[in-house]
Swiss-Prot record:
Residues 233-259 are annotated as: Catalytic specificity elements (CSE). Expressed in seeds. It catalyses: 1D-myo-inositol 1,3,4-trisphosphate + ATP = 1D-myo-inositol 1,3,4,5-tetrakisphosphate + ADP + H(+); 1D-myo-inositol 1,3,4-trisphosphate + ATP = 1D-myo-inositol 1,3,4,6-tetrakisphosphate + ADP + H(+); 1D-myo-inositol 3,4,5,6-tetrakisphosphate + ATP = 1D-myo-inositol 1,3,4,5,6-pentakisphosphate + ADP + H(+); 1D-myo-inositol 3,4,6-trisphosphate + ATP = 1D-myo-inositol 1,3,4,6-tetrakisphosphate + ADP + H(+). This is Inositol-tetrakisphosphate 1-kinase 4.
Amino acid sequence: MRLNGEISSGEEEEEEKQTGTTTFSSQKVVVGYALTSKKKKSFLQPSFTGLARNRGINFVAIDLNKPLPEQGPFDIILHKLSGEVWREIIEDYREKHPEVTVLDPPDAIQHLHNRQSMLQDVLDLNLSDCHGKVGVPRQLVITKEKDPSSIPYEVTKAGMKLPLVAKPLVVDGTAKSHELFLAYDEFSLSAVEPPLVLQEFVNHGGLLFKIYIVGETIKVVRRFSLPNISKRELSKVAGVFRFPRVSCAAASADDADLDPNIAEHPPRPLLERLARELRHRLGLHLFNIDMIREYGTKDVFYVIDINYFPGYGKMPGYEHVFTDFLLSLVESKCSNKKLAA
């Protein structure tokens, strides 16, 4: 059985050799993982696996060529593979092995694969009493059935304001699904292939806040983003422009000399409430939120994307945060067993 983002048996054997060393903890926690090779490299860095091993955590690669129930036993399973086959495997395992913590439930993850549904939970929130306002840019969904030539008409009919950000509707883990286009006029959108989500562009000072969630822990990292667009520029420029993934590690803004009005982090009470509500509504432990502050305001924020199991390797101090989180899951489960006994 080979799945999207498969792990080779050689990688599995090497990982088992690396995780077979003695730990300094009396209690060992076994974390099975099913990750793409790229994800494994960025997430399971030596600094992380070494710290985790010293605190009693062993990472073991799941062999995708063998039935999952025949492997383990596991305390926790970490996974991020695409495809219906894997989804069915992990869902079946989760139902039959409730003693194992699966991060995260497949159905909950699926919710974030659609950019329309992922932001609906933010729209449903009421955070008016939390030192700020959080919303979602006005958006329009263009389904696969739509003729691209009809997009300008749909935009005009919906009363969307230019410029518009166009993103693929489906997030499937590929680089293509994270591309975005910036359209200065509605007619140029005929060149972009549906299905799409069109969002009104909100000027935000060229800065984006990546809010990493690991259980109850919140970490904020600033990233450079698309610059403000003036009315003058909008009147002179036409066309649609393609951008790669905007918020990458190389575009870190944490050490830059920025205008304090732009660079100031969102209020902590607001982030804590937002993270808590989304954890509950999404049913996820591991995700990040891409948030912007409307330029010229202090407390008006927009969520523009939510990603499952993001690139935690880019989050400062992720090794300690993740190690503490994994141990807390096991400790919580042990405590619940004692209370039930």
